[in-house]
Amino acid sequence: MEHLAFSSRLESALKKLEVSAEISYATVLETHRTLFQDFYHWAGQDRLITTPDKEISKGDVGSDLRTEFERPSQIKLAVDYGLRLASDKEKMRAKAGTVMGLFAFAHPFLDGNGRTILLVHMELCFRAGFSIAWAATRKNEYLQALSQEINSPDEGILDSYLKNFINPIANRSEWLDQILNIQGLDGTSSIDAMDDKVYVAGIANTPEMLDRYTAQAAKSRYKTEP
């Protein structure tokens, strides 16, 4: 049902991105709303609205693959910083993985994050004069690189991974088929290639959660001069 809702609204979401004068945080929210309005009553609302007191994470506590996402009050900061990087065409090409990592770390929504930020990222790449061959990526390799990017944002891990898939600019008429051919987005898998596994929520203001946020904040993602 969710895949059907997503695929039926995909063309409309792509068209809205195409005609947007600029890509902003509001654009990200609108893209999510367009894609999932038939499935989630909260489509287009970020976690600051839907779950302002919850911490969202992925993976087992203590695992090397444990990923802590941005706290609700900082979601817009993370997305805006990624958009600021992307506004410079040269930086967008060099730091395509950094931008995607910031969007993924922000994790604006309770569900549908990966598919939403994929579309936004594709549009940003197009405006910067290149494309990424997402259908050539492999789900597990990509998600591992993405998790490592979030946990170690200064190492350029996802930049290095995505450089292998940078292509000349792709015609917009090809985007729909390209997206639906990405491993996991063709409707044959119960888990989306861009929305991996189950996320666990906790109360954001507990000492444990605050310690985790402090550890993430120490990684200095948001530099004054990116």
Question: Where do the model's predicted regions map?
Answer:
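FIC/Doc superfamily catalytic core
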Residues: 1-111, 115-226
